[in-house]
């Protein structure tokens, strides 16, 4: 995203939204890719608020690899259902998309939506170095406007900030 923004996002002791402005005007369609977790739940809450205000519909998307076993696909479906519950009365649908490249699949799907809202990563520094940071790649490459949502996790967030400074 950028060094100043990265620092603010990492150091903030509150929930944070980072927006890369793309298209102008109210969105008609929101893409909400999710892999679960507190940042994804916050992203769903943001999508719900925007959709209620604008009348937009929300597509909740989960990416699985071709090798994903049936049990994990069932968990993915359950995760989508939990996200739909967060969206409450907002017009929404779900998609399970099969791809070997999660970020590229999200970027491709973003072309069909006005706005993409994604939760910040929960991955550790080593995983990000090896696999890349999916929300950042989506933020750089997705069509339209992108919002990255990061929930303050209280003591967990403060401990992570303390240990990553050292």
Q: What residue ranges belong to the model's regions?
A:
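Short, surface-exposed alpha-helical segments at coil->helix boundaries
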Residues: 44, 70-81
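Active-site phosphate/pyrophosphate- and oxyanion-stabilizing loops and adjacent acidic/basic residues
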Residues: 6, 48, 81, 104, ...
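Charged helix-capping and loop-helix junction motifs
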Residues: 2-4, 75-79, 131-135
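Short helix-loop-beta junction
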Residues: 50-54, 81-91
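Short low-complexity, flexible loop/linker segments enriched in glycine and/or proline
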Residues: 31-33, 75-76, 109, 133, ...
């Amino acid at each position: 995203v950028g060094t100043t923004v990265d620092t603010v996002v990492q150091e903030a002791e509150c929930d944070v939204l980072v927006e890369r402005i793309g298209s102008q005007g109210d969105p008609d369609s929101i893409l909400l890719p999710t892999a679960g977790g507190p940042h994804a739940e916050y992203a769903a809450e943001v999508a719900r608020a925007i959709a209620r205000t604008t009348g937009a519909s929300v597509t909740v998307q989960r990416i699985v690899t071709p090798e994903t076993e049936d049990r994990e696909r069932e968990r993915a479906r359950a995760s989508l259902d939990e996200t739909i519950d967060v969206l409450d009365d907002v017009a929404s649908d779900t998609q399970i998309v099969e791809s070997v490249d999660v970020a590229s699949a999200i970027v491709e799907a973003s072309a069909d939506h006005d706005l993409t809202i994604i939760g910040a990563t929960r991955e550790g520094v080593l995983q990000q170095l090896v696999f890349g940071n999916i929300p950042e790649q989506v933020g750089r490459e997705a069509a339209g406007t992108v919002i990255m949502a990061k929930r303050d996790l209280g003591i967990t967030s403060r401990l992570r900030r303390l240990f990553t400074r050292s």
